[in-house]
């Protein structure tokens, strides 16, 4: 095989509850993921060793590592170790999902790499084995593999499918700068400690609200807008106050609701329909906010025929 092309989606967390800090430094979460039509493209070519380059796409990749710390390289090495494959791969990635933006772009790269290398190398691992490898790479990698709409528990990597009917329209606003996921979680812990007398304690076993599942099942954007929630939104805004301005701007210009995606700083605005999404996109663009429209749910990582 000369090359394999795999496309994997970014995601939005339409709901996210975060439990208290565990003794191992992690948090239990309960989240509702939706895969969006903002994709990462990974092309895998035969090679003697494992390497990655970035080409095309719409994201500045100049600061991204290309050594063994890159998540796509880690994915290829993990698959090679698991299967005993002794060759290599040259990975070429077109990035469209913002870096450190809360949309799982690096996770999409890793998921796409697992699928691409499995096909290129002929290792033919089953879906469950690929999911197990994905979970070892990061909490969001399994979802990038399966796509659609799903509930994530544990670190977010234990997935169960969630029925979502119809199509949801989103306008994604890319706030300036980047936010490190560990930094946002640490800020959440500090916020809870500072305001322990004012806010309810974190649920030790968080769950997704029934209203979220009902709205997704009904395919009702207005209903979903009422229940969008993210425990990481307040700490993300505290670290990057400009997020609050973007949220206000989108909602003033007709979005049903806005939510910080994951650990931010990307803000996802839910629109009533395509026309509403276009109106929000135009208004935010006029205010010099970088935006893109997307729909969901979409498929997870899969091989394309070029």
From Swiss-Prot:
UniProt GO BP: isopentenyl diphosphate biosynthetic process, methylerythritol 4-phosphate pathway; terpenoid biosynthetic process
Reactions listed under catalytic activity: 4-CDP-2-C-methyl-D-erythritol + ATP = 4-CDP-2-C-methyl-D-erythritol 2-phosphate + ADP + H(+)
GO molecular function: 4-(cytidine 5'-diphospho)-2-C-methyl-D-erythritol kinase activity; ATP binding
InterPro entries: GHMP_kinase_C_dom, GHMP_kinase_C_sf, GHMP_kinase_N_dom, IspE, Ribosomal_Su5_D2-typ_SF, Ribsml_uS5_D2-typ_fold_subgr
EC number(s) on file: 2.7.1.148
Record: residues binding ATP: 98-108
Source taxon at top rank: Bacteria
Keywords attached to this entry: ATP-binding, Isoprene biosynthesis, Kinase, Nucleotide-binding, Transferase
EC category: transferase
Record: active site: 11, 140
Function: Catalyzes the phosphorylation of the position 2 hydroxy group of 4-diphosphocytidyl-2C-methyl-D-erythritol.
Similarity section: Belongs to the GHMP kinase family. IspE subfamily.
HAMAP family referenced in this protein's UniProt entry, alphabetically: IspE
Protein name, entry field: 4-diphosphocytidyl-2-C-methyl-D-erythritol kinase
Source organism of this protein record: Leifsonia xyli subsp. xyli (strain CTCB07)
